A protein has these predicted regions:
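Transmembrane alpha-helix segments characteristic
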Residues: 309-332
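Short hydrophobic/aromatic helix or loop-helix immediately within or flanking a transmembrane segment
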Residues: 59-77, 83-106, 272-277, 329
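Loop-to-helix entry region of an early transmembrane alpha helix in multi-pass inner-membrane enzymes
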Residues: 85-88, 92, 96, 104-125, ...
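Membrane-lumen/periplasm interface segments of specific transmembrane helices
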Residues: 32-51, 60, 190-191, 202-306, ...
Length: 351
């Protein structure tokens, strides 16, 4: 049956496992996070941009990091600087955690880096436990390595939402599969409060619910409640939009007007990304061609190819989650960071 394909794995794969594996993974990923920070500093130093330690830290305020840190420090604003007003499009889950850490560390950039480091290390531990439900120790470690060493892994160290989102999605799936669906649903709800793509966790949770209902010939009410909790995080975000801007969907307007961002189709994305890549090459824009458009194209097609090859071996819920996530994430009409969006999609390293 199609909903059972790949779903007959035991509750845990019996295999020898080194002692204190969680602590080892946590320490290893904290060390990797530090290495990523030092490598970034080293590359900038070689480029003649090292500066003081304070300036080295300020570098991490680039790209979307500054938006998350502004929100953590000052919250959302309804009027004033247009660049600050449109920050409503960035969900509050990560900034709220950074704001809590700022009670201990007043510097927003240091609090953001620490938050990401701890979430990255914690995510590694939870991802390993999730992988062990289907894989032996070596297979789980191999998949975890693919995840944390993938191109774009520096996003896990940056003061951005990737590490927290990975932690929450892995926790939601692990708790759901180990018969703690309410806790899993709460983690899923906070994932949707952190990134809108967290809404798509509803797909694997619903799939597991249907699979278990068929296997047991009854529906577990706790699984239903757990799955229904997931959209509540996004509903809370829409409520914040209403409080700040008077429109629960104001973020869609800002995305369209400020970033020309809408929901589209993967085929259109591949077409315009290829077009921009070729245009950049012909006009001498090598930096954009090799640093933006080519990595996007490689990430999009590589992830799809990996999943196509591995689909028969994956749980059906994982395949369904990948397809739903991929269609929405890659279908954006102005996709600038496909490696970043696909980095936190767990079926990719499994493939």
């Amino acid at each position: 049956r199609f909903w059972q394909r790949g779903d007959d794995a035991p509750a845990a794969v019996p295999a020898a496992e080194p002692a204190h594996m969680g602590a080892r993974i946590f320490a290893a990923l904290l060390a990797l996070d530090l290495v990523l920070l030092l490598l970034t500093w080293g590359v900038r130093a070689l480029a003649g941009q090292s500066g003081t330690s304070a300036q080295a830290l300020e570098f991490w305020r680039c790209t979307d990091s500054r938006h998350y840190l502004d929100i953590a420090r000052d919250g959302y604003i309804a009027a004033g600087d247009p660049d600050r007003v449109v920050q409503l499009v960035f969900l509050p889950g990560y900034p709220l955690v950074v704001r809590a850490v700022m009670r201990l560390i007043p510097s927003d950039i240091c609090a953001g880096l620490l938050t990401s480091a701890l979430c990255f290390a914690g995510a590694g531990c939870v991802v390993y436990r999730l992988l062990r439900l289907d894989l032996p120790h070596r297979g789980a470690v191999r998949a975890l390595r693919f995840l944390v060493l993938a191109p774009g892994c520096f996003f896990f160290a940056a003061p951005m939402s990737e590490s927290l989102f990975l932690l929450l999605t892995a926790a939601a799936l692990y708790l759901a599969r180990t018969r703690r669906p309410i806790l899993g649903g709460l983690c899923g709800a906070y994932a949707t409060f952190t990134r809108s793509l967290g809404l798509l966790l509803f797909v694997p949770l619903l799939w597991e619910l249907v699979h278990d209902a068929v296997q047991r010939r009854r529906v577990d009410a706790r699984q239903v409640v757990g799955a229904l909790l997931v959209p509540l995080g996004f509903a809370a975000y829409c409520y914040i939009n209403w409080c700040v801007a008077g429109n629960p969907l104001q973020f869609l307007i800002y995305q369209r007007e400020h970033w020309n961002q809408r929901t589209g189709l993967f085929f259109s994305t591949a077409a315009y990304q290829t077009d921009y890549f070729l245009r950049s090459l012909t006009t001498g824009g090598w930096r954009d061609a090799l640093g933006l458009w080519l990595p996007n194209l490689i990430a999009c097609f590589a992830a799809l190819g990996l999943l196509a090859a591995a689909a028969p071996k994956l749980r059906a819920s994982q395949t369904a989650w990948f397809l739903a996530y991929y269609i929405v994430a890659v279908g954006a009409t102005w996709l600038l960071s496909a490696p970043r969006y696909l980095l936190v999609l767990l079926p990719v390293p499994l493939a």
